[in-house]
């Protein structure tokens, strides 16, 4: 299978997000990479589903709360930026202060 660097990045995000989702479902608090991967994967999937950039920027703030992450992680994640593929092309989605 021949993958571009961008496709490899998306697969890595998806794999990390699966680990994060399983840990979250078991009641474990997510660390920094897990939290970012969890939010990033949701944004990528939302773009494929046809949501707009502004919808995804709002949606990204609803995915995790301070109770879902380890102490101090919410303060570390100031923004999450994901280059997502939309029906009309690739766009950068930025979610500011995603963990509230």
Curated annotation (Swiss-Prot):
This is Urease subunit gamma. The keyword Cytoplasm applies. InterPro entries: Urease_gamma (IPR012010), Urease_gamma/gamma-beta_su (IPR002026), Urease_gamma_sf (IPR036463), Urease_subunit (IPR050069). GO terms for molecular function: nickel cation binding; urease activity. Keywords: Cytoplasm, Hydrolase. The lineage of its organism: Bacteria, Bacillati, Cyanobacteriota, Cyanophyceae, Nostocales. It catalyses: urea + 2 H2O + H(+) = hydrogencarbonate + 2 NH4(+). Transmembrane segments: none annotated. Its main location: cytoplasm. One of its GO terms (cellular component) is cytoplasm. Pathway: Nitrogen metabolism; urea degradation; CO(2) and NH(3) from urea (urease route): step 1/1. Its EC number is 3.5.1.5. The gene is ureA. The keyword Mitochondrion does not apply.
């Amino acid at each position: 299978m021949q993958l571009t660097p961008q496709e490899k990045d998306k697969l890595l995000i998806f794999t990390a997000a699966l680990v994060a989702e399983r840990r979250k479902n078991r009641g474990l608090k997510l660390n920094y990479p897990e939290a970012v991967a969890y939010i990033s994967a949701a944004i990528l999937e939302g773009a494929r589903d046809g949501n707009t950039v502004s919808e995804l920027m709002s949606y990204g703030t609803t995915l995790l709360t301070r109770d879902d992450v380890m102490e101090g992680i919410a303060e570390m994640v100031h923004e999450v930026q994901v280059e997502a593929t939309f029906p009309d092309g690739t766009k950068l989605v930025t979610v500011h202060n995603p963990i509230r």
